[in-house]
């Protein structure tokens, strides 16, 4: 798990989040995501639950880097996407592969998805949603059209404000410090 901060005079890390083309089929062991934990501290009880359980993402998928952003980094990111202020803590799952074939034409700006835990006030409910989220990622990490699976899950669960497809993410909006 990576903790990104800019203390001690180290140069600021810059993420080059550009989707890759994939030649091989996806497997459960294929690196698929960059996982970002964004948390400004608005919802302390839910933040505590997430921070206690986010290591599970790394345990389930050590091939996917997990970045725990500092409060300052989280604020800087949310300044670029103010519509998400107050919805953190959130887990951003950046998909490193472009969708193949027709799906890339249907969703040309697809970049991944996120779980907005800040809209939940009860820590136990947040933990249950985090567990469902990890189960969703586990079941669908080899899907050719992950955005289709997200849409299907949204329709099934009716959680349109909980898990959202990141359609308009640009390098600048995900340039995290």
Regions flagged by a language model, labelled:
Residues 1-67, 71-73:
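Local sequence-structure signature of Cys/Sec-based thiol-disulfide redox active-site neighborhoods
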Residues 35, 66-68, 91-93, 115, ...:
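Hydrophobic beta-strand residues in large extracellular and virion-surface proteins
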Residues 36, 49, 77, 126-136, ...:
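Charge-rich, solvent-exposed alpha-helical interaction surfaces
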Residues 45-50, 77-80, 102-104:
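A short acidic (Asp/Glu
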Residues 71-77, 97:
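Exposed regions on extracellular, virion, or secretory-pathway luminal proteins
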Residues 80-109:
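A short, hydrophobic beta-strand/beta-hairpin element that forms part of a small beta-sheet core
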Residues 108-148:
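Ser/Thr/Gly-rich flexible loops in soluble cytosolic domains mediating phosphotransfer, phosphorylation
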Residues 144-177:
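Membrane-inserting effector segments that mediate pore formation, membrane fusion
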């Amino acid at each position: 798990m990576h903790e990104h901060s800019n203390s001690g005079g180290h140069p600021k890390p810059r993420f080059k989040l550009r989707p890759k083309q994939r030649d091989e089929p996806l497997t459960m062991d294929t690196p698929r995501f960059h996982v970002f934990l964004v948390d400004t501290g608005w919802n302390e009880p839910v933040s505590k639950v997430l921070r206690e359980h986010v290591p599970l993402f790394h345990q389930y998928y050590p091939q996917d880097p997990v970045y725990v952003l500092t409060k300052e980094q989280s604020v800087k990111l949310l300044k670029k996407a103010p519509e998400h202020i107050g919805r953190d803590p959130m887990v951003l799952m950046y998909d490193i592969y472009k969708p193949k074939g027709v799906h890339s034409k249907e969703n040309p700006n697809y970049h991944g998805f996120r779980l907005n835990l800040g809209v939940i006030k009860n820590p136990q409910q947040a933990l249950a949603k985090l567990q469902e989220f990890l189960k969703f990622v586990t079941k669908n990490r080899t899907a050719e059209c992950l955005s289709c699976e997200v849409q299907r899950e949204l329709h099934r669960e009716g959680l349109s404000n909980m898990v959202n497809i990141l359609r308009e993410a640009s390098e600048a909006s995900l340039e995290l410090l």
